[in-house]
Amino acid sequence: MPTINQLVRQGREVEKIKSKSPAMENSPQRRGVCTRVYTTTPKKPNSALRKVAKVRLTNGFEIISYIGGEGHNLQEHSVVLVRGGRVKDLPGVRYHIVRGSLDLQGVKDRKQSRSKYGAKRPKKA
């Protein structure tokens, strides 16, 4: 434990809060270009083929981001909008791709939670 005199001379060091999405650089979203689109398997209790994309952002960061929803139209040079938000069962995936914006289409035939998947309101019969 420091003495009062030591605290007067040096002071306490403020703990820096580490960002959970450093590549965003305090932006809500970032634009990027897909460099690779592939599937990967989740951590232990779960089993699936999760769709992910490696994206080079406009600020130079290369990140792995998750493509939510059923089906997608992404290819290698697609331009996408990326937001923060990790996927708990995919290590290293700390970002999501925004559906229905830029080159990524919304989920087809989506009736519920449409705003999260960029789906337009269905036409009345």
Swiss-Prot record:
**Keyword set, alphabetical order:** Methylation, Ribonucleoprotein, Ribosomal protein, RNA-binding, rRNA-binding, tRNA-binding
One GO CC annotation, please?
small ribosomal subunit
Q: Where is this region: Disordered?
A: 9-31, 106-125
Q: Which InterPro entries match?
A: NA-bd_OB-fold, Ribosomal_uS12, Ribosomal_uS12_bac
Q: Which PROSITE patterns is this protein grouped with?
A: RIBOSOMAL_S12
Which Pfam family is an annotated match for this chain, by its short name? Ribosom_S12_S23
Q: Which GO terms describe its molecular function?
A: rRNA binding; structural constituent of ribosome; tRNA binding
Kindly list the positions at which 3-methylthioaspartic acid occurs in this protein: D89
Disulfide topology: none
GO BP terms: namely:
translation
Residues making up the signal peptide according to the UniProt record: none
Q: Compositionally biased, Basic residues: which spans?
A: 113-125
How is this protein organized at the quaternary level?
Part of the 30S ribosomal subunit. Contacts proteins S8 and S17. May interact with IF1 in the 30S initiation complex.
Q: What's this protein's family per the entry?
A: Belongs to the universal ribosomal protein uS12 family.
> What the protein does?
With S4 and S5 plays an important role in translational accuracy.
Can you say what this protein is called? Small ribosomal subunit protein uS12
